[in-house]
């Protein structure tokens, strides 16, 4: 994958602003461990390049983001609605980022996982870019992975 942190920063800020009305600002890095409950949305890229795009957010922020998407109160949302919303956020980010990748390429449907002390791993891939953002007092992560040759 050949996407820069500048491209990721622009795409994430635009998706959060346009879809959710939430300002997401890049931060240099985070010492924040994935403690507590996190939600991870993963989109796979295939074609001229192969890899994955993973968006990981703390559950309370995921609930707020979903509430913004559905114009609802955070407490009124089911876990399924929160996962659907975060899958769609990852889909929008991946859809925009794929345009910066060699063509032809395609993206998968999102896979969404939730768990305590969650750490997402995609076998056969290496991290090529890890970016952190701050929004509404929370920090979240967007990671790009490249499929290793022969994997």
Language model feature labels by segment:
Residues 1-151:
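N-terminal auxiliary interaction/assembly segments of multi-subunit proteins
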């Amino acid at each position: 994958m050949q996407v820069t942190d500048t491209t990721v920063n622009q795409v994430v800020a635009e998706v959060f602003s346009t879809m959710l009305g939430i300002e997401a600002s890049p931060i240099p890095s985070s010492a924040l461990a994935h403690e507590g409950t996190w939600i991870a949305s993963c989109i796979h890229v295939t074609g001229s390049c192969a890899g994955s795009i993973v968006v990981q957010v703390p559950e309370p922020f995921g609930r707020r983001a979903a509430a913004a998407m559905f114009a609802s109160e955070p407490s009124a949302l089911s876990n399924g609605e929160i996962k659907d919303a975060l899958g769609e956020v990852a889909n929008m980010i991946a859809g925009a980022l794929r345009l910066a990748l060699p063509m032809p390429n395609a993206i998968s449907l999102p896979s969404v996982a939730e768990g305590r002390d969650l750490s997402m791993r995609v076998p056969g891939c290496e991290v090529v870019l890890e970016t952190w953002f701050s929004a509404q007092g929370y920090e979240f992560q967007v990671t790009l992975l490249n499929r290793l040759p022969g994997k």
